[in-house]
């Protein structure tokens, strides 16, 4: 498991750390996910959650822990969450500091099932987040039916935004919608100072990406904040 921080530039604090799957020798997510099948999907999803919580406790992770989950691996939210709740209790990690992100790694075929999971998790006290907003299923149709606590802007939507007026208009419109709905916005995949500056000027305060820190395997990476 690797960890990458999500930073709050208003006070240079850590909003959360995202747990990113890695192989036992540090192999990348693509290598690991290529070995996940329909038969081992559930056990893989459960193992990732437990591993993320165990390492978070060992590393004394500050702030929130963001965990990706696969909707197709969850058949009944109240049953599939038991191992997560038991581990959180065992390592003394408050559930209100756990943020569940809907991952884009698989095709969501049953939107009502996804909505049921998100509503159930929110009812249990977890933070809910939609990853890659603006891509695939993670768009306005989903937002119309469920308003998560957090959305993460799709990396493709913000890539080169400092020199792309169309992307600027789309992101500004998304930010306005989220303000009206009281949804927190995270810009992920930030790699350049230009992208960061453009988004900061639009009012974004939460960022994730190589500009700030690369993921660290079984560790919390040092953070580099751009000059104000």
What are these regions (language model features)?
Residues 10-13, 103-108, 137-228:
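EAL-family c-di-GMP phosphodiesterase catalytic domain
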């Amino acid at each position: 498991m690797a960890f990458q921080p999500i930073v709050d530039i208003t006070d240079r604090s850590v909003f959360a750390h995202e747990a990113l799957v890695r192989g036992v020798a540090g192999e990348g997510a693509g290598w690991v996910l290529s070995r996940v099948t329909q038969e081992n999907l559930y056990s893989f999803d459960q193992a990732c959650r437990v591993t993320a919580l165990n390492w978070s406790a060992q590393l004394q992770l500050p702030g929130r822990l963001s965990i990706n989950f696969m909707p197709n691996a969850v058949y009944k939210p109240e049953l599939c969450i038991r191992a997560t709740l038991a581990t959180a209790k065992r390592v003394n990690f408050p559930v209100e500091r756990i943020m569940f992100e809907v991952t884009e790694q698989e095709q969501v075929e049953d939107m009502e099932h996804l909505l049921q999971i998100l509503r159930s998790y929110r009812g249990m006290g977890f933070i809910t987040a939609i990853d890659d907003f603006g891509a695939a299923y993670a768009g306005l149709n989903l937002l119309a039916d469920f308003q998560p606590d957090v959305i993460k802007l799709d990396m493709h939507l913000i890539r080169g935004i400092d020199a792309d007026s169309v992307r600027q208009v789309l992101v500004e419109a998304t930010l306005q919608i989220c303000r009206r709905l009281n949804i927190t916005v995270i810009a992920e995949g930030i790699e350049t100072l230009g992208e960061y500056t453009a988004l900061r000027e639009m009012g974004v305060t939460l960022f994730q990406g190589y500009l700030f820190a690369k993921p660290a395997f079984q560790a919390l990476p040092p953070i580099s904040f751009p000059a104000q």
